Amino acid sequence: MSNSSSVYDWFQERLEIQDITDDVTSKYVPPHVNIFYCLGGITLVCFLIQFATGFAMTFYYKPTVTQAYNSVSYLMTDVSFGWLIRSVHRWSASMMVLMLILHVFRVYLTGGFKRPRELTWVTGVVMAVITVAFGVTGYSLPWDQVGYWAVKIVSGVPAAIPIIGDFMVELLRGGESVGQSTLTRFYSLHTFVLPWSLAVFMLMHFLMIRKQGISGPL
């Protein structure tokens, strides 16, 4: 008996991986499914590209108001293929938003939000909100003029909310004005809170799809 077969048998005995493999590879695909049903999967691919390129940029990015812009400039001009990594990150971000919008339209037009898939739709809407938050927080990280004023405007929007508005503004900014605490918060959101939140909701989304299957034609 070969070593590879022994290893496989060891895992099979404990995890029954063959049953998992059979379930994944034998899932029924309805005949009405076409290329537009791939938009959600493309959105996932864009997210994975975002994760990989974003992780690479954390080796060079410095989340301080005095060094953020210069660290991005250094990445673009001095790091080997740094310009490509950041460009792919930006392009895939735009592609992710576009694919998400098209995916939402496809699901809505084909009635994929109806019973019994309401919770699948809800998790999708939550992921759409998280994706928008990704864009807002990522836009500010270079800390150039565009990023600074974008943060100032966006973080000031909750001020219009009665009672808790001022508290939310101070929570986002880390104080009364935009500064280092604001950049730190946005960096933390963009690189830790939002990615893991999106990953959790993606897992829930996919498990529901696996359980309920793809919605039928109208």
Curated annotation (Swiss-Prot):
Heme c binds at residue 38. It is a multi-pass membrane protein. Heme b 1 binds at residues 103, 205. It comes from the Bacteria. It holds the Pfam family Cytochrome_B. The chain crosses the membrane at residues 35-55, 93-113, 119-139, 189-209. GO terms for molecular function: electron transporter, transferring electrons within cytochrome b6/f complex of photosystem II activity; metal ion binding; oxidoreductase activity. Its cofactor is heme b; heme c. It is found in: Cellular thylakoid membrane. One of its GO terms (cellular component) is plasma membrane-derived thylakoid membrane. Heme b 2 binds at residues 89, 190. The keyword Protease does not apply. Its main location: membrane. GO terms for biological process: photosynthesis; respiratory electron transport chain. Binds 2 heme b groups non-covalently with two histidine residues as axial ligands. Gene3D superfamilies: Cytochrome Bc1 Complex, Chain C. Coiled coil: none annotated. Keywords: Electron transport, Heme, Iron, Membrane, Metal-binding, Photosynthesis, Thylakoid, Transmembrane, Transmembrane helix, Transport. Heme 1 (or BH or b566) is high-potential and absorbs at about 566 nm, and heme 2 (or BL or b562) is low-potential and absorbs at about 562 nm. Belongs to the cytochrome b family. PetB subfamily. NCBIfam families: PRK03735.1. The 4 large subunits of the cytochrome b6-f complex are cytochrome b6, subunit IV (17 kDa polypeptide, PetD), cytochrome f and the Rieske protein, while the 4 small subunits are PetG, PetL, PetM and PetN. The complex functions as a dimer. Component of the cytochrome b6-f complex, which mediates electron transfer between photosystem II (PSII) and photosystem I (PSI), cyclic electron flow around PSI, and state transitions. HAMAP family: Cytb6_f_cytb6. This is Cytochrome b6.
